[in-house]
A protein has these predicted regions:
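Conserved "HGTGT" condensation-loop signature of ketosynthase/thiolase-family condensing enzymes
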Residues: 1-277, 281-475
């Protein structure tokens, strides 16, 4: 609009100047009239054009999806828009944000929590409190448990999808062009490499569950197109999630105006249930130029992998140490940072075995050079030492925990996948510019019914007063 007004001003000034030049000198206007013609009148026309143009500009309506180029600089990173996590250690009444902090040892139950008073031994420390999918009698197959997990992890997002205008994904606004629907959502999924769960069958289970929960292709009032989810499976072990995460970032870079999900699931101790080794995670991601109209929970750079075989033996420096140093340098550089910026480490070295000690020693040796005061025990979190062998769910569970730590402590967190002796896997999670840091003295939101059970963690909208929300509530 400003450019148009400037053009109008210049054209009017030129016309007035030419008109004045062609008049006989004896008939020329007085000086004040010349000023009117050469300056004031063009300004008036320019102002009118500015105002009238502004009247025709579209204004974003509540719920409208705006696509604004944010022009992020530097290496490609993804915004974390939302996180959902299920594990038998989770209490269904506290939100996902609290669950992650509770697991990290950073949050506590509310003062006067009835369950803590009633059963202090069970609810005062991180331990299984209830099964997500019950398998009494151990009769349910691995794929059946997977199917039920998909229903449970999607339901908290689906509850608000239809009926809540403020939900990130919603079909509530009157006009479908203002929807942000889940038809065609791209999903990168890490699952265990087990014969009981074929990747093609698993992908179909996920597609069917998403279609059912969000009524894709159903009534026109709930779905504008019959496009099934685009689900891609990666079957593997503890590092499979890094592969899925890398694929999701590739997709977002190629599709800057879309969102993507990165998911994982495993139940390594099946047919046993209520085990903390069970994890199901959804990371809702968007590219750096996607206007979510929310503050990011954190930023994720590209995962990197460095193979031990690609390095030569050096005196006093094993190839594994070289590979890990290269991986950490690449992971931090991919986030526009350096290795000296690492403020916390989340890893899967485990405990109680010689191999766990070697993993910790390697990580400590690499970090002690650039960060001589870094204490891997006090500045690190050994997830599998607490939860057990979490299988294919390891990498993305660690990323979810890293998002919580980076958000609330304001430091970059390195996630290290140590289980492959022949490769170093790493990714850096960076804190957001505007976090909502929890206050230990404040009461956490708790669900009073199924409507808010297993409440996901979403970045808060930029257009609302955050003070109106209870701590831990987001939608």
């Amino acid at each position: 609009m400003a450019v148009l007004a400037l053009v109008v001003f210049c054209l009017c000034a030129m016309v007035m100047a030419l008109t004045t030049a062609e008049v006989d000198p004896a008939q020329q206007d007085p000086d004040w009239e010349k000023v009117m013609k050469l300056l004031v009148l063009p300004l008036v026309f320019a102002a009118l054009s500015f105002v009238l143009t502004g009247c025709t500009t579209n204004v974003a309506k509540p719920g409208q999806v705006t696509k604004v180029k944010l022009k992020q600089e530097g290496p490609f990173k993804a915004q974390v828009v939302g996180v959902q996590w299920l594990n038998p250690l989770i209490r269904r009444d506290y939100p996902t944000e609290w669950q992650l902090l509770w697991t990290l040892g950073l949050s506590k139950p509310n003062e006067g929590d009835f369950q803590v008073k009633d059963k202090p031994k069970k609810f005062s420390s991180v331990q299984p409190v209830a099964s997500i999918v019950s398998n009494i009698g151990q009769r349910k197959s691995f794929s059946s448990v997977f199917w039920q997990y998909m229903e449970d992890v999607l339901r908290p997002i689906g509850r608000r999808y239809v009926g809540n205008l403020n939900s990130f994904y919603t079909v509530q606004p009157d006009s479908p062009k203002h929807w942000r629907e889940l038809a065609g959502i791209h999903v990168e999924f890490a699952i265990p490499a087990r014969p009981e769960l074929n990747p093609d069958d698993a992908a179909q289970i996920v597609r069917d569950a998403i279609i059912k929960e969000f009524e894709i292709g159903g009534r026109p009032t709930l779905s504008s197109r019959n496009t099934p989810p685009d689900v891609r499976m990666t079957a593997g072990g503890a590092n499979a999630g890094f592969t899925s995460l890398a694929a999701a970032l590739d997709y977002l870079e190629a599709h800057p105006q879309e969102t993507a999900w990165v998911m994982t699931w495993d139940a390594p101790e099946h047919p046993l249930d209520e085990r903390m080794t069970e994890n199901c995670v959804i990371l809702v991601l968007a590219g750096p130029d996607y206007d979510t109209r929310r503050e990011a929970l954190a930023w994720i750079a590209r995962p990197v992998v460095r193979r031990v075989r690609d390095f030569d033996v050096q005196p006093g420096e094993p190839r594994a140490v070289q590979a890990w140093r290269a991986a950490m340098e690449a992971a931090t550089a991919g986030a526009g940072r350096s290795i000296t910026d690492i403020g916390y480490l989340i890893h899967d070295a485990g405990k109680g075995r010689d191999v766990s000690g070697r993993r910790l020693a390697t990580l400590g040796q690499v970090l002690s050079g650039p960060l001589p005061e870094f204490n891997i025990l006090t500045q690190g979190f050994n997830t599998t030492a607490l939860l057990g062998d979490t299988g294919a769910g390891t990498a993305l569970t660690n990323v979810a925990l890293a998002i919580a730590y980076a958000h609330h402590r304001g430091v970059p967190v390195l996630v290290a996948g140590t289980t492959d002796a022949e490769a170093a896997h790493a990714v850096l999670i960076s804190p957001p510019v505007r976090p909502r840091v929890f206050d230990p003295a404040r009461t956490w939101f708790r669900a009073r019914g199924e409507g808010n059970a297993y409440l996901p963690w979403w970045g808060l909208r930029k257009d609302v007063d955050w003070g109106r929300y209870m701590q831990g509530f987001s939608e």
